[in-house]
Structure formats: structure tokens, C-alpha cells
């Protein structure tokens, strides 16, 4: 019964064949048991029953749980399902239950307190208790009951599930730097929390979520602003983050087309391992905010009003036909596919792609545009790192991990932050730094001035070759440079920018911007929705030449609408208007 093995050769059987006439549900259940046993037999050669997963519960029955545990929640009575009148039900075959209205259904769903532990499928404690056949009845005794901390907008702390392993404490102190967690109290009352039991919001917490990743149980979990976690199955996909130039590999979890969680893959970790910054782990939630641009907006008397995609297409067709000059601008925040789409439009009017001069830097000509498979291997080739100015959180963590191997870290003009406590040396002037041929110089192009960057390049060139690592806050900086946009801009009658408000848009007769978010003060006449890195299948080049991919886990159709618009404007060929063309 526990394996469906018949004892005859390698034959497993269930359902009606084994039971006789029975229900389909029983047959399906037998099939699942047999499938699990067959898989184990093929893997190990043993025929054994599946272990019953260990489940930790507050009590054996609901009646044993004290109502005081839920005193912090407002008690809302359950709504009764509207039903067909009895007299009518007797003489008809209509559905008796009429169903809730949308408002009532949403209200009823909000009554749910919790859906159990959100890491029950990955919890190490549960796994070990299952493997060793732990019986919780043998470990009776007193229990600590701690209130669950919901004060942080993105991190939930449930001390009741903590096993005091100290992983979060060490990671926060030794890898990330803030050291905001620690053991408080002693003995049985010991608790892992910030000093004096305060909220994480009252500490120097970076909100990077690294403590969540290293927690082996459910004591630390993510919290989403617009979606309630639940234990239902999720669609998993791997892609790269698109919020800066580091290009971290991320794992997205989706339910019904809605992103519910962004984390790192346990099975296929990228160069960033389990490391993500605040933006990478939680920043995606901004794409579900109220200021997200989802429909075209036309400015009328200084106020933006919603219009349809067709109306927006007709408006662009009318305005561009009235102008004598056109300009199409790209930005390093968009994918290569989006740049190529706009290039088709520029080609239509025999003009070249343009870009705001603010995206240009003196070092652009020195940056390699060649794709790299393992770009951050460069960190392994040096023994000392000189960091000028502030860096992206993940890149700083990668450098810290190298430092823990015995390498030297020197900071120059780094703003006050927890990362500073790891520095072996700290300087205010780059010329004071003592270096060797094994020194790598690192800076973020967006976080220091052009003058400071120039001084660093001159200083580094005196010490050796290929010893500079340039990072940016741009999603697709090398890809942007590879398109060779024109930075010498003049006033045009019609201007359109993708991922940026067009340069000198106020002086144009008509201006359009394809953007991700609304802005009531946008200096353009028409706003068109743009897909985020989670809403299209695309490609980009990260700062060091890594080819990054987007997989559209949100199942968005914004890029489809844009390609339809470009096709109707005769900017692209019919073949180009099909998604497979770009895959």
C-alpha cells in the first residue's frame, strides 16, 4: 500500500487494477505513490515508502490554540454565501449558491490571517526532522511565544521559528557590514534581534535580504507590499536583474502572471551567488505601484489624460508627418532589442540614433564592448582593490568576499556606510594611496565626478595595464555604446525618447517619451508605456560585457503593443512585429 509494488519483477500497480472498482481520486493517489516509489527505485535500487513530511503545528486542534495569540488582529465575521430562495431551488436546477460579488470576495479573502510557513518546502529543520523520523510528542515542555515583527516593510521576523544558528548574525556582521542582529537575553529566553529588541527600521540595516537567504528555517522571510504570500505552486524562471550594470542572476517566482518574489537560485547560482542588493531583491515591487505607466497619456492643457494605443498611434502619425526633422533617442536603461526597434524608426527617416550628452563619458572609448562569459573573474587576478567612491551593494559584497581570502581593500572618498568598517586603509585623496602591479582600481561612473574619474584613470595608468573596473547604474551601458548614438543634438520638430525624456523636448513641436512610470510634470506631449526588465524577453550587456537576459516572467504584452504601434506607423517590417523575430 505504501509503494504500490506488486512483488512481481519491477511491476508497480494501483487504482482499479489493485483495489477493484473505486474512485478516480483514489486511482490518482495510487499513481502518485507509485511514481514516487518508482523514482526512488530507479535512483537507489531500493523499494521504500515515501517518508511522511514532518509538520510543526501550534497545536493538534484549533480549539487548543488560545484566541489571545490573535488579539493583534481585528476579528471580522465570516460572510454568508448568498443562496437561491428555498422555494425557487425546489422547482429548478439553478445553482443554489449565487456567489460573492467582487467586493465581498476580496473582503472575505482579506480575512485570512496566514497560510502556514512560506518556506515549508525548503526548510532544513523540516527536512532533517523528516529524515530522522522526529516525533514532536517526545519533546514536550515550555514554549517561548514571541510576537511576529511586521515593522519592516520588506522583512518579516518570526522569532518563534528561530533555531539560534547565528547565520544571519554572522552574515550581517562579517559580509554585509551593518551588524544589526545579535543575541539578546540569556538561557531559554535568548532571542535573535536588533539591540534592545528594536525594529530593523531603527537600525543601519541595508535591507539587502541576505539574512533571509541564509536563514535555514522560516524565521526571516520576504514581505511584499502588493501581494500576500501563499503556499500555492509558483512558476520559476531564471534571468538577470535589470536595475543596474552588475547584471546579477535572479530567480523570479510568479503566480497568475504576478511576480511574487525575486531571489537567487539555489540550484543554478550566478556569479553573485546568494547576493542581491535592496533594489534587486525588493525594488521590482515598484513596478506594481500606482504610478506605473500602463496606458498612453496625452497632455492636454498641462494635464495628462489617458488615451488608447490606437489613438496614440494616430496622434504620432499625424504629428510626425507635420515635422521637417525627427530625432530618436535611446538610453542605457533599455535593452538591445528596444534600441534596435528604435533604430528601425530612425532608419525610416534617414536619421541616426541619438542620445543625451549626459550619458557620455570620457572613458567610453576605453570600455571593451566584447561580450564576456565570466566577467567578474577579473577580481581573482588581483591582490589589492582600490575603490574610489561608492559602489553597488553586490559588487561591494563580491570585493568583501575576496578580502576575506586575504586580499587588501583600500577605500578612497567612500561615503560613510557599514562597508567602510572592512577597509584595510581609507584615504581622502587617490594620490596618497600606495599600490603595486597587483592592484585593481574600481569605481562607479555615476557616483563620482568626471574630474575624479579622470584623475583615477591617470593614476591607474601609471601602475599598469587593464587594471580598471568601471561600473555604472545603467542596465545596458556597453550595449548602448555599441549602438554608437549621436551625442551632438540640435532642436528637432519631432523628438521621441525611449527610457529617457528627449533632449530639448520643450523646444520641439511634438515630443514623445516611452517610459516605465508616470510623471505629471513630464516635459513631453505624449507618454507611452515601456516594459520593465521583468516584462519582456530581451538582451543587454552588463558593465563588464556579460550578456544578460530577460524572460518576461510577468507575461506582459506591453512590448507587443509597442511593436504593433511601430508596425502601424510603418517603422518596422511585418516580420519584425512578431515576437519570435527577436528571439
Label the model's feature ranges.
Residues 1-12, 17-214, 218-221, 244-276, ...:
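Ferredoxin-type iron-sulfur electron-transfer modules and their immediate structural context
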Residues 93-97, 304, 557:
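A general boundary/transition motif marking the beginning of the first structured unit of a protein
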Residues 2-13, 535-554:
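Glycine/threonine-rich phosphate-binding loop and adjacent beta-strand/alpha-helix elements that clamp
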Residues 120-142, 555-583:
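N-terminal leader/propeptide and maturation segments of large enzyme subunits in energy/redox metabolism
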Residues 28-35, 39, 313, 317, ...:
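Short, amphipathic alpha-helical "lid/cap" segments that border enzyme active or binding sites
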Residues 158, 164-165, 170, 228-536, ...:
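Catalytic alpha/large subunits of respiratory electron-transfer oxidoreductases
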Residues 209-227, 337-340, 347:
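Amphipathic alpha-helical
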Residues 196-198, 223-234:
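Cys/His-rich Zn2+-binding cysteine-cluster or related metal-binding knuckle/ribbon modules and their
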Amino acid at each position: 500500500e505504501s509503494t504500490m509494488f506488486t512483488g512481481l519483477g519491477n511491476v508497480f500497480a494501483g487504482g482499479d487494477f489493485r483495489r477493484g472498482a473505486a474512485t478516480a481520486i483514489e486511482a490518482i493517489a495510487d499513481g502518485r505513490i507509485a511514481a514516487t516509489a518508482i523514482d526512488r527505485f530507479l535512483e537507489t535500487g531500493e523499494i521504500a515508502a515515501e517518508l511522511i513530511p514532518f509538520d510543526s503545528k501550534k497545536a493538534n486542534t484549533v480549539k487548543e490554540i488560545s484566541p489571545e495569540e490573535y488579539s493583534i488582529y481585528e476579528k471580522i465575521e465570516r460572510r454568508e454565501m448568498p443562496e437561491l430562495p428555498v422555494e425557487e431551488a425546489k422547482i429548478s436546477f439553478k445553482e443554489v449558491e449565487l456567489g460573492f460579488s467582487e467586493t465581498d470576495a476580496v473582503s472575505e479573502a482579506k480575512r485570512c490571517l496566514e497560510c502556514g510557513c512560506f518556506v515549508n518546502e525548503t526548510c532544513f529543520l523540516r527536512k532533517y526532522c523528516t529524515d530522522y523520523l522526529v516525533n514532536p510528542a517526545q519533546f514536550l515542555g515550555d514554549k517561548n511565544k514571541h510576537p511576529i515583527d511586521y515593522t519592516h516593510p520588506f522583512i518579516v521576523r518570526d522569532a518563534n521559528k528561530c533555531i539560534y544558528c547565528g547565520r544571519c548574525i554572522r552574515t550581517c556582521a562579517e559580509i554585509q557590514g551593518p551588524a544589526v542582529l545579535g543575541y539578546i537575553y540569556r538561557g531559554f529566553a535568548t532571542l535573535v534581534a536588533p539591540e534592545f529588541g528594536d525594529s530593523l527600521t531603527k537600525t543601519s540595516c541595508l535591507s539587502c535580504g541576505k539574512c533571509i537567504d541564509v536563514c535555514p528555517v522560516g524565521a526571516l522571510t520576504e514581505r511584499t507590499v502588493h501581494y500576500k504570500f501563499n503556499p500555492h505552486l509558483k512558476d520559476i524562471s531564471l534571468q538577470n536583474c535589470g536595475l543596474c550594470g552588475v547584471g546579477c542572476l535572479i530567480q523570479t517566482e510568479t503566480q497568475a502572471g504576478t511576480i511574487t518574489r525575486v531571489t537567487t537560485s539555489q540550484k543554478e547560482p550566478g556569479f553573485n551567488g546568494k547576493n542581491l542588493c535592496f533594489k534587486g531583491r525588493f525594488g521590482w515591487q515598484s513596478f506594481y505601484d500606482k504610478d506605473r505607466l500602463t496606458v498612453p497619456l496625452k497632455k492636454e492643457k498641462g494635464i495628462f489624460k489617458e488615451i488608447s494605443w490606437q489613438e496614440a498611434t494616430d496622434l504620432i502619425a499625424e504629428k510626425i508627418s507635420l515635422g521637417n526633422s525627427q530625432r530618436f533617442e535611446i538610453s542605457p536603461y533599455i535593452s538591445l532589442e528596444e534600441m534596435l526597434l528604435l533604430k528601425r524608426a530612425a532608419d525610416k527617416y534617414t536619421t541616426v540614433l541619438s542620445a543625451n550628452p549626459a550619458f557620455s563619458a570620457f572613458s567610453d572609448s576605453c570600455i571593451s564592448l566584447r561580450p564576456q562569459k565570466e566577467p567578474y573573474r577579473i577580481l581573482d587576478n588581483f591582490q589589492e582593490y582600490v575603490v574610489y567612491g561608492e559602489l553597488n551593494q553586490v559588487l561591494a559584497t563580491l570585493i568583501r568576499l575576496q578580502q576575506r581570502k586575504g586580499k587588501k581593500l583600500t577605500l578612497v572618498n567612500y561615503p560613510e556606510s557599514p562597508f567602510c568598517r572592512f577597509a584595510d586603509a581609507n584615504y581622502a585623496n587617490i594620490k596618497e594611496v600606495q599600490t603595486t602591479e597587483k592592484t585593481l582600481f574600481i569605481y562607479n561612473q555615476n557616483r563620482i565626478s568626471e574630474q575624479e574619474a579622470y584623475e583615477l584613470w591617470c593614476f591607474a595608468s601609471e601602475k599598469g595595464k587593464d587594471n580598471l573596473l568601471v561600473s555604472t547604474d545603467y542596465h545596458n551601458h556597453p550595449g548602448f555604446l555599441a549602438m554608437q548614438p549621436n551625442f551632438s543634438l540640435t532642436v528637432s520638430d519631432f523628438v521621441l525618447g525611449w527610457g529617457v525624456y528627449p533632449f530639448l523636448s520643450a523646444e520641439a513641436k511634438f515630443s514623445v517619451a516611452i517610459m516605465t512610470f508616470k510623471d505629471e510634470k513630464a516635459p513631453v506631449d505624449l507618454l507611452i508605456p515601456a516594459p520593465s526588465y521583468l516584462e519582456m524577453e530581451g538582451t543587454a550587456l552588463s558593465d563588464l560585457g556579460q550578456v544578460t537576459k530577460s524572460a518576461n516572467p510577468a507575461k506582459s504584452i506591453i512590448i507587443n503593443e509597442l511593436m504593433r504601434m511601430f508596425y502601424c506607423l510603418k517603422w518596422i517590417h511585418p516580420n519584425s512585429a512578431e515576437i519570435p523575430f527577436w528571439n
